[in-house]
Amino acid sequence: MANTSLKNKKRLWLGLKTAHAQLDLAKLMFFYGDSFENHQIYELDEATEILKHPRFDATKETTLYIHGYIETPEVESIHVIVDAYQKNGDHNLLVLDWGELADGNYLLDAVQNAKQLGPKVATVLIGLFSNGLQRDLFHLVGHSLGGQMSGMVGRSIFKKSKETIKLKRISALDPAFPPFYPAIGTTAISKNDAVMVDVIHTDAGLYGAPRSTGTVDFWPNSGKTLQPGCPKRDYKLLTDIGLKDLCSHRRSWRFWAESVAAKDTPTFHAVKSKSWSDFKKFRVDESYIIQMGLNCPETARPGDYYLQTNGDQPYSKGINGITYEKNENVVFPTND
C-alpha cells in the first residue's frame, strides 16, 4: 500500500493522472437552425448518427469547435461562436462539450484529460470520415486548451490512420501556454498537425502561446496583453482568474466570431512583418495581404502577420488595420 501511495505521489508531481478520465462525459453538440436551442446532443460513440440528422448538409463545410479550460456550453464564448456560425449559414457546426473534463485543477485534471480525450476525438472523426463526412470540407477550431487539444486530435488522426489522413485545416485561438512551452509531458500544437494551421495570438506569454506555433501566426495589436479595450488585469493565478484577467485571452474567439459572421466580407486584413516593432515602423510586405479569421487562405504563405483592431465591436478596421496608427486612448504593450 505504501509503495502504491508513493507511486501515485510521483505521478502527481510529474503532472500525471492516477486514473483514466471518464471520456464518456464528453458529448458532441450538433447545432442547426437559427437559435442556440436548436441543437442535438450525441454520445461520442454515436457520432455517426449526426450524419443522419435531417438538418445535416453533407455539401457544406463541417466545423468542430473545442472550448477551453473551465468552460461549458452555457458560457458566453460558446454562445457567441454558435451565433456567428448561424449567421453565416454555410456550415454544419459541432461543439465538443467536455466541460466536466475541462474543470478542476488545470495541470492535474484538465490538461491530462485533454491528452486522453484528444485521441478519442480522433477516433470519432476517423469514424465520421469513413461514414461519409468529407475530409476536404472539415475544419477543426479550438480556443486555449481546446486549441492545444486540436493539435492532439490532428496528430492522433495522422497516426491512427497510418499517415493516410491529415486534417485540412486547424485554427487555434490563443492556444494555451502552460505546460506546452516548454513542453512538460505534453506536445504543443504545430504546423505539422494539419495541412494548414492558423493561429491567432491575443495573450501571448501569459495565458496564450508565447511564440509562433502554426503555419500562419497572426499577432493582432502585437498579440499580447493588453488588447485594446481590455481593462488593467490583476495577474492572478489560474486557480483564481476572473473575466478581467481573461479579456485579452478571450479576444481571440471574439475576433474569430466576427470573421465568421461576416461571411465573405473582408474583415481583418493582415500583413507580413518580422515583428510588432517593424510593423509599427511600416516595415511590412504590402504586396501580400491576407485575412485573419475564417477567410484566411489555406494557401497562405507561412510566417507571422500583424494588424491593428478596434477596442470594441466591430473589431475589424478593414484594410486600415495593416497601417499602424498610434492611439493615445489605447494601451499597447511596449515590448516587441
Which role fits each region the language model picked out?
Residues M1-V95, A102-N113, A122-R135, S161-I165, ...:
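Flexible, membrane-associating and regulatory peripheral segments of lipid-active enzymes
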Residues I66-G68, H143-S144, D174:
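The conserved beta1-alpha1 loop
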Residues L137-G142, R169-A172:
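Beta-strand segments within the central parallel beta-sheet cores of soluble alpha/beta enzyme folds
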Residues L140-V153:
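Glycine-rich nucleophile elbow surrounding the catalytic serine of serine-hydrolase chemistry
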Residues M152-G154, I170, G208:
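Tubulin/FtsZ superfamily GTPase core signature
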Residues K168-P179, H201-G205, G223:
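Active-site nucleophile loop of the alpha/beta-hydrolase fold
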